[in-house]
C-alpha cells in the first residue's frame, strides 16, 4: 500500500467508466426510460407487466405481480433519489441536490397516493398494466416503506398493528 487514496467517485472500472458516470447513467435511466420524473417508476417492458402471464421485475421472481408499477421498485427508487441528493450535496452541487430532494418529495407523495390502501391500512404490492391494484399483504414491502421514510407515523402504526395481529383485515388468509 502506497498511501494514495482515490475518491470512490473517481474510481474507474474495467470499462473505463468512473463511478460518478455510472451512477448518473443509472439515474438517467430511471428518470427517463422508467418515467421517474413523474414521481412513479413505471416498467413498460411487456414481459414485466404485473399480470399472471408476466414475468417478475425484481429479486422476488416467484411473485409475478411485481412489474409495471411496483411498490418494491418504487421504494428503491425513492431511496436512490435521496442517495443522489446526498452525493450531490457532499460534492457541492446544491442545485442538483435540491433537484433530487424535490423529486424525492414528489415521489413520496405519488407513492402514498398510488400504493397506500386506506381501507386495509397498508401498502399494496403493485398496479399492473391493466390498472388492477394488486394486494397480497406483502409484509416486507410494508416494512421497507416504513424503513425508507415513505410511511407516516400513523401509517406505520397501522402496518405494525396489522402485522402483530392486533388489527385484523377482513379477507386475509393469514393473521399476526
Predicted regions and their residues:
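Well-ordered alpha-helical scaffold segments within catalytic/enzyme domains
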Residues: 1-14, 76-94, 141-155
Amino acid at each position: 500500500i502506497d498511501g494514495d487514496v482515490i475518491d470512490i467517485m473517481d474510481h474507474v472500472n474495467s470499462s473505463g467508466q468512473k463511478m460518478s458516470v455510472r451512477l448518473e447513467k443509472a439515474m438517467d435511466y430511471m428518470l427517463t426510460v422508467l418515467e421517474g420524473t413523474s414521481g412513479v417508476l413505471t416498467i413498460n417492458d411487456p414481459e414485466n407487466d404485473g399480470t399472471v402471464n408476466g414475468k417478475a421485475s425484481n429479486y422476488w421472481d416467484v411473485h409475478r405481480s411485481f412489474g409495471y408499477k411496483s411498490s418494491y421498485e418504487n421504494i428503491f427508487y425513492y431511496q436512490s433519489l435521496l442517495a443522489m441528493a446526498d452525493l450531490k450535496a457532499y460534492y457541492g452541487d446544491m442545485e442538483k441536490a435540491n433537484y433530487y430532494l424535490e423529486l424525492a418529495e414528489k415521489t413520496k407523495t405519488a407513492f402514498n397516493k398510488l400504493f397506500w390502501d386506506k381501507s386495509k391500512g397498508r401498502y399494496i404490492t403493485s398496479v399492473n398494466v391493466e390498472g388492477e391494484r394488486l394486494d397480497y399483504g406483502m409484509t416486507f414491502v410494508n416494512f421497507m416503506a416504513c424503513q425508507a421514510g415513505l410511511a407516516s407515523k400513523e401509517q406505520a402504526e397501522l402496518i405494525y398493528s396489522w402485522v402483530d395481529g392486533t388489527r385484523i383485515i377482513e379477507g386475509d388468509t393469514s393473521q399476526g
